[in-house]
Every structure is written in C-alpha cells, then in structure tokens.
A protein has these predicted regions:
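Boundary at the C-terminal end of the N-terminal hydrophobic targeting segment
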Residues: 25-29
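Bacterial N-terminal signal peptides
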Residues: 13-23
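Short, contiguous, well-ordered secondary-structure segments
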Residues: 1-3, 22-24
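Bacterial N-terminal signal peptides that target proteins for export
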Residues: 3-14
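Catalytic glycan-binding domains that act on GlcNAc-containing polysaccharides
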Residues: 30-175
C-alpha cells in the first residue's frame, strides 16, 4: 500500500512539474499566421546564427525581457499586461499621446525613446519577427562597440551600471 501511495505521489508531482514547465514555455501566437512558440524559438535561433550571436543568448534576453510575450509593454518601469496586439498598441499610443517616451515594446523590449525612429510605426515594433531582428542587430552592434558579449548584454538593458548589473546576471543564468 505504501509503495502505491509513493508511486501516486511521484506521478502527481511529475504531472504538476510538467504542467508548470509546459505552461510557462512562452508559447504565444505571433504575427506570423498560425505560428506558435515553436516557430518563435526556431526563428530566434535562426536570427542568432545569421547575426553570429552565441547560441541561446538572444533567447535568454527575450526570456528575461518579456517571458517570450510578443505583446509585452513596459511604461516607465511598470509592466503592462497586454494579451493581444490591439491592446498593446492602444496602451502604447495612449502613453505616447500623454508625452511618455520611456516605453519598452515587444518580445525583446525595444525602447521607444531610443529606437522608435528605426521602425515605421508601433505595430511594426510589436511584430515579433521585426522586434527580434532589431534586437539582434542592436546586440551585435553593442558587442562590436564594447568588445565582449557580457558587456553587450549589460548595455542592451542600460548604459547605467546601477541598472544593468542585476539584469546581466539574470540573462547569464538563463543563457
């Protein structure tokens, strides 16, 4: 009887663990019709290879930045939960209309103030493929500018050491 209870506990624990892990894989739909988390991770890997970014680094950054949520929005340090693109666009436009420019947008959390001019519009910034491509080019340019991937990671988040120390640790652990 004890063995049966232990087996049931083990099976229950395994199911709970798998539910948690699989439920948090970041499998969000993207702008790529009928895409899913698998497409997203495959795309990130492809972008890493094309831009000569070490395997898994861009994926780690995206995971830390947004949890793989293509509609992630952060306004002046406050995370806004947007479940779809239209809600994210509306939230961002409202903030911009109020004069706010410190807005991190999309799956790789590209900052509107510093990088918004490199996109046609907010919708393009929220497009996961475009957002990831831009993040890769930004990360590569930071690597060239600062000489190491660890420094590039820090500066991807912020040039301010008080802001990037904890962030870079999270990314390195995820990497």
């Amino acid at each position: 009887m004890t063995k049966v209870l232990n087996i049931k506990k083990t099976i229950t624990g395994t199911i709970l663990l798998l539910s948690f892990v699989l439920g948090n894989t970041g499998a969000y739909a993207t702008d790529n019709t009928s895409s899913n988390g698998y497409w997203l991770k495959k795309h990130i890997t492809s972008v890493e290879q094309r831009n000569r970014i070490p395997r898994g680094l861009l994926s780690a950054i995206v995971g830390v930045e947004s949890g793989f949520n293509p509609y992630a929005v952060n306004i002046e340090g406050k995370t806004i939960t947007a479940n779809d693109k239209s809600k994210a666009v509306k939230t961002i436009k409202n903030a911009v209309n109020q004069g706010v420019t410190n807005i991190d947008i999309g799956i790789a959390q590209i900052n509107y103030r510093w990088h918004g001019d490199n996109f046609k519009n907010i919708e393009e910034m929220l497009n996961p493929a475009t957002n990831i491509e831009y993040a890769a080019k930004l990360l590569s340019s930071l690597f060239k500018q600062h000489g190491t991937w660890h420094k590039a990671i820090r500066h991807y988040h912020s040039a301010n050491p008080n802001h990037h120390k904890q962030y870079s640790r999270k990314v390195v652990i995820a990497w």
